[in-house]
């Protein structure tokens, strides 16, 4: 039989989270961000749950081609624009909208021969200092684009660095609005955190489009200040495996490589068929939460390439049977309906839910429900 591990993508949860993003930004259209292969979910697997969006935003032409092959005829936005001049031809052929964030991209457009003018999103560096024109140069970049016959329509975009934290977005939205004042065109500024935390009461933050990313996949961008449940989000990916062995420990016995865990009393542990080669974080410490048969317990010892060890004592003390064949939910929704949010696992491992989703290994079988 196949190794007993599986990831499940939940279509209804994707639909629920998309509806939640839309409700948080009334009157704005929603980009479903599917970069990084839909945050590890798989573009093809996530498409049915996200096809109610107004457009798809992604990174490269390969992802754009895949979305078109799925039958999508609506807007597609390249969030980082094109990477070389010849990409513009495929943008024309696939009717892609694309960001413009540097002078070189404007140069490529000006030299491009096309019969289908381009829809571009001029990106401002309003304070994050990654991509985009700084406010002092933004209008000059707009003027260059506006003079090009290759450009049909110019929209405006920026990206917030601190929408999920106490610093907030005021300094960036003010800079953006000042630089774009009176310029004609649509605006998109909000990522997931800004959409949930700031868009409801400020039309400037809602803009014409919001870019829903991690919110679609059931993770809270501002965890642990707020949980996914607080925002009404449902888990869209479940990683589950089976217990393939058990051991009875006595006080003083150690577990795993490096003997990093020592039992302080008699206890039962289960060996789960999941390890860092499956995408589970190797640096997750003892105490990282896990569900066994829907009951919350913890990992013990180091994560191995193919196995994790978990404490079964709390289940036995509660009168819940657990042993070989029992279900272990590493994150997501257990068969009984109990939920372990991916953000909790990520926090214990010192990372974020985004990384765990994107790290799901190719060897893990994936099903869609």
From Swiss-Prot:
GO biological process, one term: D-alanine biosynthetic process
Cofactor(s) the record lists: pyridoxal 5'-phosphate
InterPro entries hit by this protein: Ala_racemase (IPR000821), Ala_racemase/Decarboxylase_C (IPR009006), Ala_racemase_C (IPR011079), Ala_racemase_N (IPR001608), Ala_racemase_pyridoxalP-BS (IPR020622), PLP-binding_barrel (IPR029066)
Lineage: Bacteria, Pseudomonadati, Pseudomonadota, Betaproteobacteria, Burkholderiales
GO molecular function: alanine racemase activity; pyridoxal phosphate binding
Record carries keyword Nucleotide-binding: no
Protein's job: Catalyzes the interconversion of L-alanine and D-alanine. May also act on other amino acids.
Organism of derivation: Paracidovorax citrulli (strain AAC00-1)
Coiled-coil segments on the chain, per record: none
Gene name in the database record: alr
The protein, known as: Alanine racemase
């Amino acid at each position: 039989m196949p190794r007993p591990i599986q990831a499940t993508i939940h279509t209804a949860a994707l639909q629920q989270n998309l509806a939640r993003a839309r409700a948080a930004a009334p009157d704005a259209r929603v980009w479903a961000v599917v970069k990084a292969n839909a945050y590890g979910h798989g573009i093809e697997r996530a498409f049915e749950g996200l096809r109610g969006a107004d457009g798809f935003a992604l990174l490269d032409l390969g992802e754009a081609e895949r979305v078109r092959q799925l039958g999508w005829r609506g807007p597609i936005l390249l969030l980082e624009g094109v990477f070389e001049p010849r990409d513009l031809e495929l943008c024309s052929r696939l009717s892609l909208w694309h960001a413009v964030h540097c002078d070189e991209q404007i140069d490529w457009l000006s030299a491009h021969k096309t019969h289908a003018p381009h829809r571009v999103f001029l990106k401002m560096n309003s304070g994050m200092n990654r991509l985009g024109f700084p406010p002092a140069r933004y209008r000059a970049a707009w003027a260059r684009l506006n003079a090009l016959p290759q450009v049909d329509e110019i929209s405006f975009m920026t990206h917030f660095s601190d929408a999920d934290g106490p610093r907030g977005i005021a300094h960036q939205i003010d800079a953006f609005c000042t630089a774009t004042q009176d310029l004609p065109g649509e605006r998109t500024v909000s990522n997931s955190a800004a959409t949930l935390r700031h868009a409801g009461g400020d039309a400037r933050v809602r803009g014409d489009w919001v870019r829903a990313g991690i919110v679609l996949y059931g993770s809270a961008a501002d965890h642990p200040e707020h949980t996914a449940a607080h925002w009404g989000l449902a888990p869209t990916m479940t990683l589950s495996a089976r217990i393939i062995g058990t051991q009875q420990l006595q006080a003083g016995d150690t577990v795993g490589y490096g003997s990093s865990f020592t039992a302080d009393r008699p206890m039962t542990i289960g060996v789960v068929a999941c390890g860092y080669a499956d995408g589970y974080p190797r640096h997750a410490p003892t105490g990282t939460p896990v569900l066994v048969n829907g009951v919350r317990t913890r990992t013990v010892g180091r994560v191995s390439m193919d196995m994790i060890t978990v404490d079964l004592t709390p289940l036995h003390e509660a009168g819940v049977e657990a042993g070989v064949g029992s279900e272990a939910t590493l994150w997501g929704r257990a068969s009984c309906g109990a939920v372990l949010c991916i953000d909790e696992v990520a926090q214990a491992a010192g990372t974020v839910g985004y990384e765990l989703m994107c790290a799901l290994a190719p060897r893990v079988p994936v099903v869609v429900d």
